[in-house]
């Protein structure tokens, strides 16, 4: 037996839904738990292992996770967030599953420990712009925000975000990007969709050219959406929950 445990939302008499919350007021969200507690309910699926491999130290690449609601994208992203913040719990989890599955390659995975981790569920609409997430949650965010306001450009530029990453390298995990992006509109005065498009390109390019400074992980529902297509310009690693490998993996599980 693998010793897997159901997530709490599936163990009660009523199931509220399959989308997990990163944080909530009750302190029971995925990121409110300790890393060791959350990883106990995390199985090293093919999707999970491919994602961890893609963001490994020394070879990290931008990652786009594609899948419909309820397929496990948010759980994967929460696990990734925990892994980058708790090395001991992550190494123990990798070693444990390496032994259980008799797969030494799992124990050999090495993440970029020490990076600042920013994880945001964009569909909750806590921020108007993606750069507001960085200004609020990155240690150097306030300084970069002040510099940008002096520049007066519509979108924080490449050099400013690179400076932020050089001050403190970070991994940016954006869940439900497509849901958020499709809700944006352009007007004569506020071209929010265009601004979002331009800024995500800046993040993608920095993540591609300087993976040691910025690792970008984004989830979308559909690979043919406008939200996904703009991310595909830098040829990221695609984790497709609808793919045949993922389907076989779930059947085995």
PLM features: residue spans?
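Residue-level preference for the first positions of well-ordered beta-strands
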Residues: 62-64, 117, 169-171
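Conserved P-loop NTPase mechanochemical-coupling segment
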Residues: 27-33, 113-154, 176-190
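Walker A/P-loop-proximal flanking segment of P-loop NTPase domains
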Residues: 1-71, 78, 82-84, 229-253
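Conserved P-loop NTPase catalytic core
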Residues: 104-124, 128, 202-253
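Phosphate/oxyanion-binding active-site loops and adjacent basic polyanion-contact surfaces
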Residues: 30-48, 73-76, 123-134, 150-154, ...
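Mid-core helix/loop region of P-loop NTP-binding domains shared across ATPases and GTPases
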Residues: 141-178, 184-185, 194-206, 210
């Amino acid at each position: 037996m693998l010793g897997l445990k159901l997530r709490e939302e599936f163990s009660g008499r009523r199931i509220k839904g399959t989308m997990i919350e990163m944080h909530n007021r009750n302190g029971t969200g995925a990121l409110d738990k300790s890393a060791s507690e959350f990883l106990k309910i995390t199985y090293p699926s093919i999707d999970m292992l491919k994602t961890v491999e893609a963001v490994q130290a020394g070879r990290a690449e931008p990652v786009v996770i594609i899948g419909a609601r309820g397929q496990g994208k948010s759980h994967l992203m929460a696990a990734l967030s925990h892994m980058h913040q708790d090395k001991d719990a992550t190494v123990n989890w990798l070693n444990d599953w390496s032994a259980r599955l008799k797969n030494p390659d799992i124990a050999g995975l090495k993440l970029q420990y020490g990076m600042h981790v920013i994880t945001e569920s964009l569909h909750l609409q806590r921020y108007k712009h993606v750069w507001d997430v960085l200004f609020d949650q990155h240690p150097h965010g306030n300084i970069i925000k002040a510099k940008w306001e002096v520049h007066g450009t519509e979108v924080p530029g490449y050099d400013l975000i690179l400076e932020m990453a050089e001050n403190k390298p970070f991994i940016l995990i954006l869940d439900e990007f497509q849901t958020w992006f499709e809700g944006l509109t352009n007007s004569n005065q506020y071209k929010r969709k265009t601004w979002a498009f331009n800024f995500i390109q800046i993040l993608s390019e920095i993540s591609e050219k300087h993976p040691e400074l910025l690792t970008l992980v984004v989830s979308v529902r559909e690979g043919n959406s406008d939200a996904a297509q703009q991310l595909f310009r830098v040829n990221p690693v695609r984790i497709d929950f609808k793919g045949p490998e993922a389907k076989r993996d779930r059947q085995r599980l």
